[in-house]
Structures are given as C-alpha cells and as structure tokens.
C-alpha cells in the first residue's frame, strides 16, 4: 500500500508554517500543507488543539466552499480574542454567500441583518459584546484613500488592501462596489436637484411676467415654494453614506 511521507514537524513548527502561509495569502499552498500532515492519532490530537492550525483549516474550508467543515471547526473549538475578527468575518461571509446562492440574488443590508439574526456568532469566536457591523474609522480611512486612487481595484490590490485592513478580499470588493453605487446615486441626486431648481426659477419668472408688479411677486411664491419642496425631496432620495453591512 502506498504510504504518505511522514513529516517530522513538531506542533509548534506546523503552527509556524500555517501562520506564514496564512499571512502570505497563499491558500492553495496552505491547503496542500494541511493535507500532508500526519494522521496518526497522537499527532492529530496535538494539532487539533493548536489554534493556528485550526484557524488555517477554517480559512481553507472557507476558500474551498466547504462551509459545513468551516462551521464545525468554529463551533467546536474555543479561539482566543486575537482570532475573533477574522473568524467572525469568515462565519458571516459564508452564511451570506449561502443565502445569496439560495435566493439567486445579492443580499441587501436588511437581508444581511436577517442572516445574522438567524445565524448568530458562536461563543467560541465571540466574547459576547455587540458588534456594530460597521468598519472602524482607520479601516474606512484606508478604504477611502485607495478608492480615490482607483475606484476599480484589481484582485491583487484587493488582497493587499484586505491584509492592510484585516478584512477579507470579498469585503473589500463589496465596499468598493457599494461606494461606487453611492457616488452614482449622489451624482444623480445633484442633477435632479439642479433640474428642479431650474424648473422652479423658470416658473416664477413666467408668473412674474404674466402677473406683473406685486401680484406677480405673490404669484411666484407658490412656484418657489414648490421648487424648494421638490429639491428637498430630491435630497432625501438616496440613503446616507453608510459603510455598514458590507
């Protein structure tokens, strides 16, 4: 029978390799390395207690679409707070992707809220504090800086920015997509506001010419008032510049 080569690595050495490959973002090599690890009961027991190895297995499970394995790892092993942020992102993103596949469409903020309510974070990767699902100010600042340089980052830049912010490449991509949508909506809102104001000015000038004198001034007031209300309505068409639920 063919025998797999036995790697004489200590659990600490295995953990070090996992951490290095995780930081490099080379998920394919990380997966191959995990597959090559020994399956002897004694070795498995030691590795199954190592957080770096467990985190690496969770990351590989996520990137290969093996969400059942991901959930099993996260629900059955207690992780330290240093790993919570990344593992929480994997948990939520996996459930989001499953929901999108089931519904056949991208999820909106309300959809994501419902998914989070249905699949709350397990206490193994959560300390019980409520999470706002908004990015920290430092993260938003970095994202905005990169957005001003390039609103359409390629996959390599997304991975680089993900490492700089502690987010996943998918989260980075979603933020850029949502930001582009908000900018387009804001531009459309401004155009509509200018059109409404221009129409209101035209109506009031026409009313003044037709009525003349004080009567004309009185007649123009409803038109000006109407244009102001329309402009106000136009301003509220788009939502606020929210950066939550990404």
Curated annotation (Swiss-Prot):
Residue stretches of biased makeup (Polar residues): 195-204
Instruction: Recite the UniProt keywords alphabetically.
Output: Developmental protein, DNA-binding, Homeobox, Nucleus
Q: Where is the composition biased (Low complexity)?
A: 217-246
The highest taxon in the source lineage is Eukaryota
Paired cysteines (S-S): none
Q: What is its main location?
A: nucleus
Per UniProt, what is one Pfam family of this protein? Homeodomain
- According to its UniProt record, in which tissues is this protein expressed? In the developing embryo, expressed in the anterior head-fold, the anterior neural plate and optic vesicle. At later stages expression is maintained in the eye, while brain expression becomes limited. Not expressed in the lens placode.
This protein's GO cellular component annotations are:
nucleus
> Region Disordered: start and end of each range?
195-246
Gene Ontology molecular function terms on file: RNA polymerase II cis-regulatory region sequence-specific DNA binding
Q: What does this protein do?
A: May be involved in eye development.
Q: Which family does it belong to?
A: Belongs to the SIX/Sine oculis homeobox family.
User: This chain belongs to which protein, by name?
Assistant: Homeobox protein SIX6
In its UniProt entry, the species of origin is given as Gallus gallus (Chicken)
Q: Gene of origin?
A: SIX6
């Amino acid at each position: 029978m063919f025998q797999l080569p036995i790697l004489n690595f200590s659990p600490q050495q295995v953990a070090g390799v996992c951490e290095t490959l995780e930081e490099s973002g080379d998920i394919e090599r990380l997966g191959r390395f995990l597959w090559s690890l020994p399956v002897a009961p004694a070795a498995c027991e030691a590795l199954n207690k190592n957080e770096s190895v467990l985190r690496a297995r969770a990351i590989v499970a996520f990137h290969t679409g093996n969400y059942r394995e991901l959930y099993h790892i996260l629900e059955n092993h207690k992780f330290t707070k240093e790993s919570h942020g990344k593992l929480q992102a994997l948990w939520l993103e996996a459930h989001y992707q499953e929901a999108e596949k089931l519904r056949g469409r991208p999820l909106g903020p309300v959809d994501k809220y419902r998914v989070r309510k249905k699949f709350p974070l397990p206490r193994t990767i959560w300390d019980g504090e409520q999470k706002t699902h908004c990015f920290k100010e430092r993260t938003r600042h970095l994202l905005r800086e990169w957005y001003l340089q390039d609103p359409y980052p390629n996959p390599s830049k997304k991975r680089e920015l993900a490492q700089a912010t502690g987010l996943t490449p998918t989260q980075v991509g979603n933020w850029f997509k949502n930001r582009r949508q908000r900018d387009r909506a804001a531009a459309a809102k401004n155009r509509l506001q200018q059109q409404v104001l221009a129409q209101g000015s035209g109506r009031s000038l026409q009313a003044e010419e037709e009525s003349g004198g004080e009567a004309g001034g009185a007649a123009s007031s409803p038109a000006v008032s109407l244009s102001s209300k329309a402009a106000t309505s136009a301003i509220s068409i788009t939502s606020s510049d929210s950066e939550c639920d990404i």
